[in-house]
Amino acid sequence: MSMEGVFLEKTKTNTTTTLPDLSLHISLPDIHQYHHNESSKESSRRSSQLENNNRSSNFELSLSHHNHPTARIFHCPDRRTLNLPHQQHYNNPIINGVHQRVDESEISNLHRPIRGIPVYHNRSFPFHQQNSSLPSLGGGDMDQISILNSSSGYNNAYRSLQSSPRLKGVPLHHHHHHNQYGVVGSSDSSSPHHHNHHHHGMIRSRFLPKMPTKRSMRAPRMRWTSSLHARFVHAVELLGGHERATPKSVLELMDVKDLTLAHVKSHLQMYRTVKTTNKPAASSDGSGEEEMGINGNEVHHQSSTDQRAQSDDTSLHQETDISSTQPRWSNSSRETWPLSNNCSSDIDTMIRTSSTSMISHYQRSSIQNQEQRSNDQAKRCGNLSCENPSLEFTLGRPDWHEK
């Protein structure tokens, strides 16, 4: 029979005078004392169970040496011991009376500071904000602990966590995820410098325009109209003619928008070619009027290249024909140039015709040189036969074959 709650009372008697009272007085135990004994037993049983479970789930978070005597051990309870409060009430209804007292003791044990890592009780744990399904670090007992606040403390904690093989219920890839994007610290306005630098770097690389590409140095194609050519001729005449004019000075005198030095240089070169090939007759008044045109220039250039192979009569005949068919133009700015506006295409055709004429001239000259060489060789031989000499020779007397 259990003797709990049974109190034996002995009456004070004088042993010398009377006999001792050996009667038993049985009464009901005190209710408050009974609940106190039950709660103490349950708390001791629960604390022993926690100690047995914590032996397999302890890992060191100290940043000091392993042999240092002041290193502290952070006890991470097992997943089974960190059930939600309502699950504990359903599974063990006897502990309902002492649950609040046990939670306070657990919180006091879990809130012990870790050496090397600051502990702040007014901020929530960062893993609990990001993922509430992490039981060992994001539970209700740990939501008031903030292990890290700066990037340096965060990196040190990450190195110490990497030393252990595996956290109970916390995979390390979540930790690496937070470190990669710089989402560290609490939810207040203070954010790490690394996160700000990374964020601004992404914005700078995304929204800034690229470096401007190098502009092509080739000038755009220019169409020389009649009025533009008249202005060009007027500038050349003011500078003393095509022989003394320079492209830069002509460009300054023309003062035309979007006209480059390359345009003036090419046009002046073509103008000099036309002026040198076509020998104009100087007028008495010095106005310098010539009879020329685009097609006339082509024929003049072709006739000048073919003068060596043709006679003077044919060249004069071509000039008279061209002068009678083509209109005349003046180099003064008051008159217009009644020719085709597509000067560039005419220049290309003129270059092609001049090149073909030069090739034909060289072919004719080579044929003439060959004929001249053959004639010289015939003159050297004269009337003598140029056959191969006989290489036969005899020894002794020439008539020994006959004998």
Curated annotation (Swiss-Prot):
Residues 274-286, 321-343, 362-372 have a biased composition (Polar residues). GO terms for biological process: abaxial cell fate specification; adaxial/abaxial axis specification; carpel development; plant organ morphogenesis; plant ovule development; polarity specification of adaxial/abaxial axis; radial pattern formation; xylem and phloem pattern formation. Residues 216-276 form the HTH myb-type domain. Residues 35-54, 273-345, 357-403 are annotated as: Disordered. It is found in: Nucleus. Keywords: Developmental protein, Differentiation, DNA-binding, Nucleus, Repressor, Transcription, Transcription regulation. Its main location: nucleus. GO terms for cellular component: nucleus. InterPro entries: Homeodomain-like_sf, KAN_fam, Myb_dom_plants, SANT/Myb. Expressed in developing phloem and lateral root. Disruption phenotype: Flat leaves. Altered morphology of abaxial mesophyll cells. Decreased number of trichomes on the adaxial surface and increased number of abaxial trichomes. GO terms for molecular function: DNA-binding transcription factor activity; transcription cis-regulatory region binding. Residues 247-272 bind DNA. Pfam families: Myb_DNA-binding (PF00249). Residues 35-45, 298-320 have a biased composition (Basic and acidic residues). Induction: Repressed by AS2 in adaxial tissue. Plants overexpressing KAN1 develop elongated and pointed cotyledons and do not produced subsequent leaves, resulting in seedling lethality. Transcriptional repressor that regulates lateral organ polarity. Promotes lateral organ abaxial identity by repressing the adaxial regulator ASYMMETRIC LEAVES2 (AS2) in abaxial cells. Required for abaxial identity in both leaves and carpels. Functions with KAN2 in the specification of polarity of the ovule outer integument. Regulates cambium activity by repressing the auxin efflux carrier PIN1. Plays a role in lateral root formation and development. NCBIfam families: myb_SHAQKYF (TIGR01557). This is Transcription repressor KAN1.
